[in-house]
Every structure is written in C-alpha cells, then in structure tokens.
Amino acid sequence: MSKLSRATRTLKKPEAGGVIRSIVRAGQAIPGPPLGPILGQRGVSINQFCKEFNEKTKDIKEGIPLPTKIFIKPDRTFELKIGQPTVSYFLKAAAGIEKGARHTGKEVAGLVSLKHVYEIACVKAKDDAFAMQDVPLSSVVRSIIGSARSLGIRVVKDLSAEELEAFQKERAVFLAAQKEADLAAQAEAAKK
C-alpha cells in the first residue's frame, strides 16, 4: 500500500458525533435492537445509555412512547434530551383505544371532544417543535385535529360518558367481526 493511499485512509475516518432521533418507551430502554446497534456503530456505551435513560424516565409511567434525541459528542459521550409523549399517544389515551383505524376515512376508531384536543394542545404547545417556532395555540389545535383524523379518531364538540361507552361497545363488536373475517381469510389462504 502506498503512502498516499494510507494518508487518504486516515483522513477519511468517520467522525463520531451527530444526533440520533428515536422514540423510546419510558423505562424500557434495552441494549438490543433498534437502538443498540445504532449506538454501537457510533461507539457509544449502550449499557450506559440504557441506564441513564431508564433513570431519567423512572418517574414516568412505564411504556409511554417518548421522543428522544441523543446528541453524540466527538469523544463518544452522549447527551440525552427526552421530549413529551407523542400526540398519537395522547389521542389514543383520550379516545380509550389501543390502535388507530385500519382504514382511515372509512371507519372511526374512537371519539374525542374538543376539550380533550385543547388539553392535549396546551401540553404539546410547550414541546420544542411548537415552542421554538412560537406557534399559536390555534395552530397546535388544528395540527392535533389533523393527527386525530389520520388515526381515524373523530373530534366532536361535546362528548358524554354515555355516548363514549355506547360507541366503545359498538366498536368492540365491529373489531370482533373484523378479527373473525381476518381469521377466515387466513384459513382460506392456507387451503390454497
């Protein structure tokens, strides 16, 4: 190998650093995939990250998805910035559902009132994405309504407990029928 090729190889060494954005569940950071390999490639101690993340999120209900930014420094240390839970988490919790609609626009997965949307907007307005750009609360509300639509959640003006309970019972029947249809389709496909 010539001196020139060795010199260029030493110049092209990748510099450790950068930002990794990910959604990690509170108290559930583990050394395995998906974050383990990414941090390992950057030379960051995976066990140290898991320990620090789980320590910082110990006061938060376990399993809540948290947007996380990991700033990797050139000396291969890191700095964590943990955001608030995602809008979809808040909307699904307010609607009392686990998943959004399978066919958005054709089915309604849940119901939330404008009061719920306003409360979520008040919390998310403090988030970096909105606070840094000085976004007015009305725009945050519209953004959350758009997210609700994409999840198949209908936003209604007022919502009583009885209306919500009736909707959830109707939705449970619909999901059971949908699951039966899926199982029948799988059985039919297996026969072929």
Curated annotation (Swiss-Prot):
The protein's location, in the record's own words, is: Mitochondrion
What SMART domains has UniProt attached to this entry?
RL11 (SM00649)
Q: Which GO terms describe its biological process?
A: mitochondrial translation; translation
Q: Name one GO cellular component term.
A: mitochondrial large ribosomal subunit
What HAMAP family has UniProt attached to this entry? Answer: Ribosomal_uL11
Reading the lineage from the top rank, the first entry is Eukaryota
Q: Which Gene3D superfamilies match?
A: Ribosomal protein L11, C-terminal domain, Ribosomal protein L11/L12, N-terminal domain
Q: How does it assemble?
A: Component of the mitochondrial ribosome large subunit (39S) which comprises a 16S rRNA and about 50 distinct proteins.
Similarity field: Belongs to the universal ribosomal protein uL11 family.
Query: What is this protein identified as?
Result: Large ribosomal subunit protein uL11m
S-S bridge residues: none
Source species of the chain: Mus musculus
Give the matching SUPFAM superfamilies: Ribosomal L11/L12e N-terminal domain (SSF54747), Ribosomal protein L11, C-terminal domain (SSF46906)
- Could you tell me the keywords of this UniProt record? Mitochondrion, Ribonucleoprotein, Ribosomal protein, Transit peptide
Identify a single GO molecular function assigned to this protein. Answer: structural constituent of ribosome
Which NCBIfam families did the record assign?
Answer: L11_bact
